[in-house]
Amino acid sequence: DISQIVEGVMPSVVSITSKMQTTGFYGFGVQESEGAGSGFILAKTDDNLMIATNNHVISEANSLTVGFSDGSTAEATIVGADADADLAVISVKIKDISDETLGKIKIAVLGDSDDLQVGESVIAIGNALGYGQSVTTGVISAKNREVSFTDGTMTLLQTDAAINPGNSGGVLVDVEGHVIGINNAKLEDTSVEGMGYAIPIATAQTVLTDIMNAKTIPAGENAYLGIIGKTMDAQYSSALGIPSGIYVTQVVKDSPAEKAGIAAGDVITGFDGNSVSTMEGLKSKISVKEAGTKVKITLKRANQNG
């Protein structure tokens, strides 16, 4: 019974309201806007509740509010994010949550997306269009689907369960109520009507764990690479005949990048054993490294394969 599955999962799903401030026209005044997304409870420590979501849900937020299944809300802060994986972890202080709410919420049970079969039934739960938690059903239409966005490519699960704006960061669960994907509504295009996408939990779990375990680097002790670069997305890559990744436009003199032999015109595709496709993603990966840390950088050079 779908209603019983949803009843068991809903206490682990949250809504996320982000408030953003932008400068008004001609630089006058400040305009405030709101965004809606979803997340799910990943872990609980003595002091904090850890919540997983998509990076694009929280990346431009000045403040975040989490709504729990019982209707209560609490302020949240960003723990960390991986822009390339479009994943983030935010936290809510336990002291800001009532005992009544703490007694109702649950930590999500993670499944195994690698074991999924095409045609298997799934349920998507999230804060669709910002109107509150909603439920849609469908099947796994495809696995390992390469999907191109304006800022890179991701390998996703495809489903015919409706995943609308606001659903991003919510859960895609199997008939056991186990999370097998993280809904992603970045792709909004009339040509893909009837297709929803989710980040496989097998992919996401490693990234989310790394984010939670990342050591805070004191100001001034962060690593520094020394390049100026531009994200080379699939559209630019195809038009210019340049590989997708970070196109290096300039290398700072005497920087670690110059000493390592990185040159203008190179395209960076990997950092420390992980693929990287955007400048934002590269910056987020560098930011959790201490100065002096040695890392492997994968790149492609004209007339070479990298």
Task: Report residues per predicted region.
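Conserved PDZ fold ligand-binding element
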Residues: 51, 257-281
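Extended hydrophobic-aromatic, low-complexity segments
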Residues: 238-239, 258-261, 306
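Serine-dependent protease modules
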Residues: 1-237, 243-244, 253, 283, ...
